[in-house]
């Protein structure tokens, strides 16, 4: 690394130029000090003026001498080689204070992320090409003879089947109580009470979960007219965090062909919060971090992590 950087640079002249810059700064400082102090007390006005002018001229000569020396050394320093393998970005890693210059590591991370994104995009493109629709020109032109769209059967499940799925999930977890209601027609709404830890309002569309709101056990989950409140957030930051993680879990557990498995998997994940205030973080081993318990639960192992420790 040192040999690469030394190509084309006279290090001895470079060192002398640094000392010359320091000397030039000292000379300029003496000039301004002379102007600041003015004429010193002497026997007569004429003597004071001559002493002041003489001292001022000497200081200016020193500035001129140091400036000429700096110009001479600058011509001897030379220029660094332009054949550096990483060009200017390679110099970012030379600063030993990594906390002040994290740009180099961020560039490497962005490069790895870009390669991974390109790899996954290629896989997705191959899968989509296998499932591409083949339509002829005649089929595209005759819109009146098209077959009517068939609605997915999973969106039109009978209420009895949904009630049976929720009832079986309720029996699976004794510490979890699930209350089902249909205040707006066929769409079900669930009030899940997990021990004496928290309550969850779940809005469903058939067997698909649309929205979840997590609140504390002692918080009110009803509106003034007695209906479940599906809009207001919890007053506590810990349950707001759990609400965000539950929304992420809904995006993770996706299996449109088997919606009952999705609901059961989500409820199993939600049940892991029974020890929200008792389980330590599996990464740092602490119960609290920034005043909050471990609010994240791994989707596969259900282990507890702080939001910053799960990265």
Curated annotation (Swiss-Prot):
Its main location: nucleus. It is found in: Nucleus. InterPro entries: Mediator_Med27 (IPR021627). GO terms for molecular function: transcription coactivator activity. One of its GO terms (cellular component) is mediator complex. Signal peptide: none annotated. One of its GO terms (biological process) is regulation of transcription by RNA polymerase II. Keywords: Activator, Nucleus, Transcription, Transcription regulation. It comes from the Eukaryota. PANTHER family: 34 KDA TRANSCRIPTIONAL CO-ACTIVATOR-RELATED, MEDIATOR OF RNA POLYMERASE II TRANSCRIPTION SUBUNIT 27. Component of the Mediator complex, a coactivator involved in the regulated transcription of nearly all RNA polymerase II-dependent genes. Mediator functions as a bridge to convey information from gene-specific regulatory proteins to the basal RNA polymerase II transcription machinery. Mediator is recruited to promoters by direct interactions with regulatory proteins and serves as a scaffold for the assembly of a functional preinitiation complex with RNA polymerase II and the general transcription factors. Component of the Mediator complex. Belongs to the Mediator complex subunit 27 family. This is Mediator of RNA polymerase II transcription subunit 27-A.
């Amino acid at each position: 690394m040192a040999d690469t950087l030394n190509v084309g640079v006279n290090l001895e002249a470079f060192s002398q130029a640094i000392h010359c810059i320091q000397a030039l700064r000292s000379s300029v400082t003496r000039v301004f000090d002379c102007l600041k102090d003015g004429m010193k007390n002497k026997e007569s006005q004429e003597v004071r003026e001559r002493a002041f002018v003489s001292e001022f001229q000497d200081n200016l000569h020193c500035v001129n001498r140091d400036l000429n020396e700096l110009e001479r050394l600058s011509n001897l320093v030379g220029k660094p080689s332009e054949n550096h393998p990483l060009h200017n970005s390679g110099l970012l890693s030379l600063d030993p204070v990594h906390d002040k210059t994290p740009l180099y590591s961020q560039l490497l991370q962005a490069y790895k992320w870009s390669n991974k994104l390109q790899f996954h995009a290629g896989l997705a493109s191959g899968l989509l090409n296998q499932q591409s629709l083949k339509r002829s020109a005649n089929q595209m032109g005759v819109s009146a003879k098209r077959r009517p769209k068939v609605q997915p059967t999973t969106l039109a499940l009978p209420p009895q089947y949904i009630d049976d799925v929720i009832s079986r999930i309720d029996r699976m977890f004794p510490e979890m109580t699930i209350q089902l209601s249909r205040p707006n027609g066929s769409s079900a709404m669930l009030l899940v009470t997990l021990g004496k830890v928290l309550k969850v309002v779940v809005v469903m569309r058939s067997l698909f979960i649309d929205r979840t709101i997590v609140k504390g056990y002692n918080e009110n989950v009803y509106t003034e007219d007695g209906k479940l409140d599906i809009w207001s957030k919890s007053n506590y930051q810990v349950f707001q965090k759990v609400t965000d993680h539950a929304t992420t879990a809904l995006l993770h557990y996706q299996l449109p062909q088997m919606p009952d498995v999705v609901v059961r998997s989500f409820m199993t994940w939600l049940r892991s919060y029974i020890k929200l205030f008792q389980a330590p973080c599996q990464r740092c081993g602490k119960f609290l971090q920034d005043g909050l318990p471990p609010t994240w639960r791994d989707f596969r192992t259900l282990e507890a992590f702080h939001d910053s420790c799960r990265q």
